[in-house]
Amino acid sequence: MKIFSRLLQEAKNLFYELQAMLSSVGARVDIDTPYVCQFSIPEHAEPSLKKTLDPSADPHWKETGASSPERYAAWAFTMCGMASTAMALGYFKDKNIKPAELAEDALRSGVYSEDGSEISSMKYKEFANWVRKYGLVANVYSKLSVKGIQHALSQGKLAIVSVSPNIRGYDTAPADQRGGHLVLVVGYDRDTGTISINNPSGFVNPNSQIKHSIPVATFKKYY
């Protein structure tokens, strides 16, 4: 069964990539989505990640929709996918649902599992099924080229992609990890050779949160 599922997924990937290859995409796409940080407020992303602010002691924890400081702390470093989903919901459905509220609902629906203090990574198949309740249709691709991403955006879609967390500081941070962090791709510019992301754990200054423009060649190293 697992082999069949994998072959089916690979066929789905191939079919989509062929569509993307044969299609023409615009020179530039720039989608204005709301920005949602996976931490309490955008200014607290950097100190939280640099361990100078303990999420359980964050005075703004309620901003995420968490039910308690403890639940915010449990989710803070795992909420990138839910923050990206909240941005998509804000754009497509004009819904303002907090990321921690989405996270707890997703947990109940099997998108995540929790064992003690450990919360798993997002389960993509379960995510695609779960997000339908909010009126979104998600397609899961295990491999997607940059042209495939551009094809999706040129059709008015958004793409949540898995990248290295180090992409927020790509000019200084090593590309020694691929995947592990979810961001929302909101645009590209073929003339300048760049791709733009909304990064739920980006920093305020210099900006790596909202429409963070990255050279495609660099993006590929972290994608």
Locations of the language-model features?
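Active-site-adjacent structural segments surrounding the nucleophilic cysteine of cysteine proteases
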Residues: 1-117, 173
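Conserved active-site-adjacent core of cysteine acyl-enzyme catalytic domains
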Residues: 5, 9, 13-16, 20-23, ...
